[in-house]
């Protein structure tokens, strides 16, 4: 089972343009921070488990709460959780609660998002959201809708 967090904010625009060969394209982009919606979930055999959205970035307390309350109750003893090396994924408490559930934590090599299968889902999910921002009253509703429509979002 692959676990990861991701996030998006509503200023993620990618301007495109043309310029002379050898010249860098420049575009004006606001440096103002906007609302960031993040999420965490697990992927097992092509299905998302325990998706949770939140405002801001993930930290150890939030990750531990998600493990205890959302993910571990859905797992069976012997399940393996594959996760990246984010510093907030590592603590003695996290190791203990995973072991108590009869599961194992396997850490991916440093800087290897290509080995985490859920990263490919995040790419598709973010593109789905970018294409539909204007259809929603607010940004958070767009993110929540993406998870509700997950079976239709992913090939």
Pin down the residues of each PLM region:
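Extended, low-complexity cationic-aromatic segments
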Residues: 1-68
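Mobile genetic element proteins and their domesticated derivatives, centered on retroelements
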Residues: 2-4, 41, 67, 84, ...
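Short, glycine/acidic-enriched loop or turn micro-motifs at the edges of active sites
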Residues: 7, 87-88
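RNase H-like polynucleotidyl transferase catalytic core
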Residues: 25-31, 101-117
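RNase H-like two-metal-ion nuclease catalytic core shared by retroviral integrases
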Residues: 36, 83-85, 92, 107-128
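Short, basic/hydrophobic alpha-helical segments
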Residues: 62-80
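Catalytic-core regions built around general acid/base machinery
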Residues: 93-101
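C-terminal anion-handling pockets and recognition modules
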Residues: 118-155
């Amino acid at each position: 089972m692959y676990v990861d967090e991701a996030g998006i904010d509503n200023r993620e625009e990618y301007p495109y343009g043309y310029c002379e060969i050898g010249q860098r394209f420049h575009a004006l982009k606001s440096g103002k921070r906007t609302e960031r919606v993040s999420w965490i979930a697990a992927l097992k055999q092509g299905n998302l488990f325990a998706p949770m959205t939140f405002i801001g970035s993930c930290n150890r307390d939030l990750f531990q709460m998600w493990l205890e309350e959302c993910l571990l109750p859905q797992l069976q003893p012997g399940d393996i959780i594959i996760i990246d090396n984010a510093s907030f994924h590592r603590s003695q408490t996290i190791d203990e609660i995973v072991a108590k559930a009869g599961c194992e934590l396997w850490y991916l090599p440093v800087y290897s998002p290509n080995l985490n299968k859920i990263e490919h889902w995040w790419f598709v999910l973010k593109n789905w959201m970018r294409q539909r921002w204007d259809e929603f009253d607010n940004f958070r509703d767009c993110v929540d809708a993406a998870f509700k429509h997950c079976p239709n979002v992913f090939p």
